[in-house]
Every structure is written in structure tokens, then in C-alpha cells.
């Protein structure tokens, strides 16, 4: 569904990095794999920090602490038990940012495994803010729901939705709400075009990201 854009001048939303995945295909915590000179998550933090008012990491916290403590940012665990996928992180963000005194209507999510997303991601998405619409990044005709501005007003609805264990697919939840897709062009590199929302799930994809990063740094 498409809603008319409503630009809100001066809005800088908070950001939530989704880092609660199980990394099954990588075989280890992919947020901590080395890309260039730093962990993958560090690249995401560097890229998102200038675009948002502040950054929080959605990651598990146990009685022994959290693997993400070393990044020096606030940590926000899922509010649901088990592993309910990215929507559980989105719900935690909705609750967290809705309850803050300085909270606006929306907050940004970005995944911990996508290091090359656009430097103007938030500016472009904010140009299309519209009440309770979910504003989603897109490329090559595909939506990327983990890169989105989420309305905090949907918290109760999302929590009710996730009470059914069958409701884990993010696109099924999106189908129930107004969404706005914002298209971004490919990233041009010395090795050719790259989807700016390319994400790293496997060792082969990590090798590709390392190769791409080398061309960007030379």
C-alpha cells in the first residue's frame, strides 16, 4: 500500500541495529567476523551513527552479560522468549523508543550483517514519513524490511501478532499495514555493481564483502 509522503523537516530518528540472529549459515556470530580492520558490526555502527540521533544494539543479554557489551552502546534484548526473528527485535525497539520522553513517531532499524548501506539512507527514508506507515528501503525492485523506519504506534499490534508462533515472517506482518518503498540505486565499485543492502550470511558472502571492501579502500 502506498500513502502520500509527508516530509517532516529536521526529524532525526533513533537507530536500532538488529543483532539478535543465530548466524546458523556462518557457523559463528557473524556480527563479530572480521571485515577489513574491524568486526562486521563495527562497520554497521560507523555507517549508521552519523544518520541517527543515537544508536542502540538489539542483542541478547544473559546472566553472564552480552557479547555486544564491548561496543560501548546501549543494549536492548528481545522482549519475547526464544528466537522469534527480526520482528522480535522490532517489537523491542517499538516498546523502548515509544517509552522515551524524547521519542518521535518512528525509529530506524538496520541489520548487523549489511556493511555497505547508503550514507543517505535515513534522509531518504525520512522524506517519505507518513503517520503510521512503515517506510522501507528497496533496491532492484525488492524491499528490504530490516532497513526501515518503524512507527512506535504499532507496538501493541505487533505484540499481539507475535503471540501466534506461526507469525514470524516479516513480510506477512507488513502486508497488514501501510508501507512505503523507497528505491536506492546500486553501489558502483571497481568490481561492478553491488546491491547497497547486500548482507553477509555465509563464509562465501563474507569473502565477497572483503573483496569489495578492498576496492573501496584503495
Curated annotation (Swiss-Prot):
Keyword Phosphoprotein attached: no
Required cofactor(s): Mg(2+)
GO terms for cellular component: cytoplasm
Function in brief: Transfers a GMP moiety from GTP to Mo-molybdopterin (Mo-MPT) cofactor (Moco or molybdenum cofactor) to form Mo-molybdopterin guanine dinucleotide (Mo-MGD) cofactor.
Subunit structure: Monomer.
Family named by the database record: Belongs to the MobA family.
Name of the protein described by the UniProt record: Molybdenum cofactor guanylyltransferase
Taxonomic placement: Bacteria, Pseudomonadati, Pseudomonadota, Alphaproteobacteria, Hyphomicrobiales
Encoding gene per record: mobA
